[in-house]
Each structure stands twice: as C-alpha cells, then as structure tokens.
Amino acid sequence: MTDTETRLKALMLRGLDGDTAAYREGLALLGVRLRAYFMRRMSGAPGDVEDLVQETLLAVHLKRSTWDSAQSFTAWAHAVARYKLIDHWRRRKIRQTLPLEDHVDFLADDAPDPGVALELDRALASLPQRQRMLVSDVKLTGLSLAEAGARAGISEGAAKVALHRALKALAERMRRADG
C-alpha cells in the first residue's frame, strides 16, 4: 500500500466516523491528486480541469457510503474520476485514448484477492461456450461487439444481448459467492 493510499484511507475512515477535519483534509488531498490526474488528460482546458475536480469530489462525497473500506480508497476514487472524465468527453464528443502508464501513479498497489480471481474463473467456466467467448473477446481482449459477434458467428445485436446476459449471470454468481 502506498503512503498516499494509507493516508487517504485513514483520513476517509476517520471522516466516515464523523471527524469533519479529517474528512476535509482527505478531500483536499484527493483534490490535489485529481487535479494532477485531470491535467495530464485535459491539455489546454484548465477551467474544465477544475470543473472535473469539483464534480469528482462531489461524487465522492455523495457516494462515499458505496466505498468498501476493506478495499483500496484510491482505486475506488480513481474509478469515480475516470467515469467523470468519460462523461465530460461524451458531453463534448471527445474521444481520447489513455495510455495505461498514466494510471500507474494513481492506482493502489494492493494485490487482488486470489480467492476472488479463482471464483471469477469458476464463474466464467460455468458460462456456455459462446457467452464465455464473448466475455473474453470483449472484456478481456478488447474486441468490439461487431468483431466478437463475427468470431462467434452472430450479429452485433445478438452479441450485445448475449454479452449482457453473460455479465448478468457472472454478477449474480459473484453475489452468491459473497454470501
């Protein structure tokens, strides 16, 4: 766990327990991280950067109860920031690719739970072959729905429906595994 992750997580936990000073400090520290994250992705738009920082901090505040304190805070906050950035680009119809190495400094260094990975492998294995192939092609390999559908011998629309059903079945299986 990084020093920033440790500090942010401790501040947010104290904030959730009612320590408003710690909560404010945690949001301020997160704001600095978010500003740097958005600046790397938003060249020439400092006003947009500030808007995104504020939107993300507001979303973190409003959705703080959804954060599982047993998990990484920075990974959760990064997901919120990423969705806010995607929403921003959609509003402006901007498409950009983000190199993975840009995310390394923000991501937590916690290793994934091997039990979860094993359960996910089991859940994938329980799917019918076509659904398993679609999940692998679209979500793991990065093929488009049209490409994955062509590989499976079905239309893009049928691939979309089959993928949706597969992901729904996986989510249900994982929920049942959590107890």
From Swiss-Prot:
Q: Lineage of the source organism?
A: Bacteria, Pseudomonadati, Pseudomonadota, Alphaproteobacteria, Caulobacterales
Q: Which residues bind DNA?
A: 145-164
Sorted keywords for this record are:
Cytoplasm, DNA-binding, Sigma factor, Stress response, Transcription, Transcription regulation
- Coiled-coil residue spans: none
Protein's name in the database: ECF RNA polymerase sigma factor SigF
Q: What causes induction of this gene? A: Slightly induced by dichromate, partially dependent in itself for expression, does not depend on sigT or sigE. Probably part of the sigF-nrsF operon.
Record's GO cellular component terms: cytoplasm
Q: Which InterPro entries match?
A: RNA_pol_sigma-70-like, RNA_pol_sigma-70_dom, RNA_pol_sigma70_r2, RNA_pol_sigma70_r4, RNA_pol_sigma_r2, RNA_pol_sigma_r3/r4-like, WH-like_DNA-bd_sf
